[in-house]
A protein has these predicted regions:
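Conserved, structured core segments of small domains
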Residues: 1-109
Length: 109
């Protein structure tokens, strides 16, 4: 089994999304995340957290689709991660995407 970092990308930061959400939307979002986490809990190493604004350091320009959160999952393959992510509430929001990165154990380097 390998660990995978899931980066939740969206055009607005998590804090901006929360600022603009109604109490009903916040409650519905929390319930959707709880339902997904319950369904795929076997694969969740770290459910993660929403992330605040991004600071860009270094040359070049920052991405317009910032990382608004993360999770760490454990699975046998990237294909398995794709099936685990089916029904993930983040993907139901307009303009969002998920980036899947396999974590390489430091002892394997």
């Amino acid at each position: 089994m390998s660990k995978f970092m899931i980066l939740y990308r969206s055009p607005a930061s998590a804090s901006e999304q929360l600022e603009n959400a109604t109490p009903e939307q916040k409650e519905a979002s929390a319930k959707a995340w709880q339902a997904w986490a319950t369904r795929v809990g076997y694969a969740i190493t770290d459910l993660g957290s929403p992330l605040a604004h991004t600071t860009h350091v270094g040359p070049g320009t920052a991405s317009t689709d910032g990382v608004s959160g993360y999770s760490i999952l454990e699975a046998g393959s990237a294909d398995e991660v794709e099936s685990i992510l089916e029904g993930n509430p983040h993907l139901a929001m307009p303009g969002t995407s998920v980036e899947v990165l396999e974590i390489i154990p430091i002892e394997d380097i």
